[in-house]
């Protein structure tokens, strides 16, 4: 067996293990192909997708509030947050570039999917929150706080930030 073939066997096993882990915790997942898992939204969870810089600020805001929530990331710079289903995107977030709410049967790449630019991975693994999906209210409230701070800060460069709304340095 060549090195590439053995890698594909190991990766396939890792992908299947991840799919079983999602299923064991009630997260709806489908395997698109040999390198890609998709989380299905709208039955158990919805997903808020944001740019990485916005996601870092949301994570800092949640962390300052003592909340640990799962966070996925794509190599193209999107971060996404699973959350309880049934909400709509608040007006403050609809006006924010590149913020998207995935609902009603949409599918989102799930770790450890391979894409041309790299790997979809966890920034905060769901096991750290026992696969608990945070409430949409908690997550959307934090995202709105960050969006408001960013809008205010753009108008007033010396604006006081809400707790955790801006990460110092690069956090990964």
Give, region by region, the residue ranges found by the protein language model.
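Conserved catalytic-core surface of thiol
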Residues: 99-143, 147
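Helical (often loop-to-helix) elements that flank the catalytic cores of nucleotide-handling enzymes
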Residues: 83-107, 169-172
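Beta-rich nucleic-acid/ligand-interaction surfaces
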Residues: 78-80
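Residues in well-ordered beta-strands of folded domains
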Residues: 49-51, 72, 82, 100-102, ...
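Signature for HUH/AEP ssDNA processing cores
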Residues: 1-76, 85-87, 126-172
